[in-house]
């Protein structure tokens, strides 16, 4: 029987998932004046149904990563609808309206919270929490990283730094790629094997992909925004640099190079 704290966390997870679905669907519905767009909230239904099925029996807990995959696919589709196209909805955002830029930023920031609630309320098992806690924090930081890059696009409409549209589209593409990569760490736990060499190779490959495709790319984009357009991003530049260094240490430890001991 789950503790009351876990039950509260599960209730919050379900509530925030529904709230985010409604809020994101409201942007195309309001700005395109078409109520049928509210049906986009159904993009989160597979994640909700799968989560309910897993919560019904703790034996299904190893499949929790599939909930995140279903969620992140729906989340990326929402982002492409709002930020993509020749005339994106984010260009039409009105600060005077409830569903304006500030509400959109807060709605996007729910993604890391939803991730932490999903992983931390799966079970009362301390063994499970010890295994998942470090991974969930790292994933949440990368999600915040991606959301902050989307905020650069939103804020460009409020205070222009002269960032060209093609560069904004490049930011959007890399953000979506980083979100799609986010389930890799959870999949890695699911695919753990007794063969130490295979496990280390897979973990090293995943870490290298995340360093290159997420933090290195975002670091490059932020430095370009800073040097080319005067966009201050010093905090997240430092974050990307720190994560890259930690990731390189992890890869060295896994591969036993540079005098590092493997684990």
Go through the PLM ranges and name each one.
Residues 43, 48, 63-168:
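Membrane-embedded alpha-helical bundle segments of multi-pass proteins
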Residues 1-107, 227, 254, 259:
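N-terminal signal-anchor/initial transmembrane insertion module
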Residues 19, 23, 50-53, 77-80, ...:
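Residue-level signal for alpha-helical transmembrane segments in multi-pass membrane proteins
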Residues 5-15, 36-42, 66-73, 97-108, ...:
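Physicochemical signature of membrane-embedded alpha-helices that form the seven-helix bundle of GPCRs
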Residues 122-229, 248-263:
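Multipass alpha-helical transmembrane domains of eukaryotic endomembrane proteins
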Residues 242-243, 258:
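Short, intrinsically disordered/low-complexity patches at protein termini
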